From Swiss-Prot:
SUPFAM superfamilies: Ribosome-binding factor A, RbfA. It comes from Salinispora arenicola (strain CNS-205). It comes from the Bacteria. The gene is rbfA. Belongs to the RbfA family. Residues 129-156 are annotated as: Disordered. This is Ribosome-binding factor A.
Length: 156
């Protein structure tokens, strides 16, 4: 097993190398507006996964995927020479769906804001369910207006 810091360093180097080679050396017309977002490499440094995003529709994404697959050998040899490892890591390219996730989260946040606004609107018009004083109050015998205390003249 390799040191995790070493693995992380090699993964970052793979990302930088693939991005620079894609930008400067690959002249495939199918290659769209691509951004290399991340790279991960296994602990034995033999397999690397490169994540990328493409600006455009699904046709641009599929064309870019085909261009990366056709340039995989050249990219692997360039990465292997630059890293100086005994074995060049195999490269796997994965379309990163970060943009779709961001759009989905934005939609969920918009729905939550709308629901909060609806709750606030309903709360502003809300009234108490029942009387203003919901509890029974026991009347004391002296507080009643109907009952008058017996006067001294009535008792004779």
């Amino acid at each position: 097993m390799s040191d995790p810091a070493k693995v992380r360093r090699h993964a970052e180097r793979v990302r930088e190398l693939v991005a620079s080679v894609v930008r400067s050396q690959i002249k495939d017309p199918r290659l769209g507006m691509i951004t290399i977002t991340d790279a991960r490499i296994t602990a034995d440094l033999r397999d690397a996964t490169v994540f990328y995003t493409v600006l455009g529709d699904t046709a641009a994404q599929s064309g870019t995927a085909a261009a990366l697959e056709s340039a995989k050998g050249m990219l692997r040899s360039t990465v292997g020479k630059a890293l100086g490892l005994r074995h060049s890591p195999t490269l796997t390219f994965v379309l990163d769906d970060v943009q779709d996730q961001v759009k989905h989260i934005d939609d969920l946040l918009a729905q939550a804001r709308h629901a909060d606004a609806e709750v606030q609107r309903l709360a502003a018009r809300a009234e108490y369910a029942g009387e203003a004083q919901p509890y029974r109050v026991e009347e004391e015998p002296g507080d009643s207006e109907d009952e008058t205390p017996p006067s001294s003249q009535d008792q004779r």
